[in-house]
């Protein structure tokens, strides 16, 4: 319940400096009297930030970053990178990074790219699944098209001609 009002007081432990990276670039340490000061959990929420000789976080609690992502859904920033085809999932996928006021909550989650950019996901599907054939499916059209392409490649080899099979670009436009 407190997390909803203290989203800007979430911190991620930096193992090198033994400090927490907080919202908007703030760096703080847990108050030495805190029971969590020696345990050093990865993610904490503090009730107050007090600046004396350095910035201290007091009244701390260990949190799960998924809680902050869910509670702060209206303020988290999501960035997506490296869209690619996953033959295992038979879908276009991308890597997602989720931050809350600059604090990384999720570093490298693989998500479906169709929700993010449907047109680009369709292009990835067409290129990788239908044209390159990297798709395990029971659809008859796909099996028939692959068989036709194999027959045309065989015919090209027999006749020593390279103009029977259309290019990948033409196949892309066809689909």
Model feature map: region roles:
Residues 1-175:
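Extended, charged helical/alpha-beta scaffold domains that provide interaction surfaces
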């Amino acid at each position: 319940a407190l997390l909803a009002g203290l989203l800007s007081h979430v911190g991620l432990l930096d193992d090198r400096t033994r400090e927490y990276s907080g919202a908007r670039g703030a760096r703080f340490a847990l108050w030495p009297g805190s029971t969590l000061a020696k345990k050093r959990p990865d993610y904490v929420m503090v009730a107050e930030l007090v600046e004396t000789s350095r910035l201290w976080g007091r009244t701390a609690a260990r949190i799960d970053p998924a809680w902050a992502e869910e509670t702060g859904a209206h303020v988290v920033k999501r960035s997506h990178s490296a869209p690619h085809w996953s033959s295992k999932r038979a879908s276009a996928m991308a890597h997602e990074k989720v931050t809350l006021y600059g604090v990384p909550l999720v570093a490298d989650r693989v998500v479906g790219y169709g929700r993010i950019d449907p047109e680009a996901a369709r292009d990835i599907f067409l290129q990788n699944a239908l044209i390159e054939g990297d798709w395990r499916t029971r659809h008859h059209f796909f099996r028939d098209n692959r068989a036709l392409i194999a027959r045309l490649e065989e015919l090209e080899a027999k006749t020593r001609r390279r103009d029977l099979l259309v290019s990948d670009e033409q196949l892309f436009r066809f689909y």
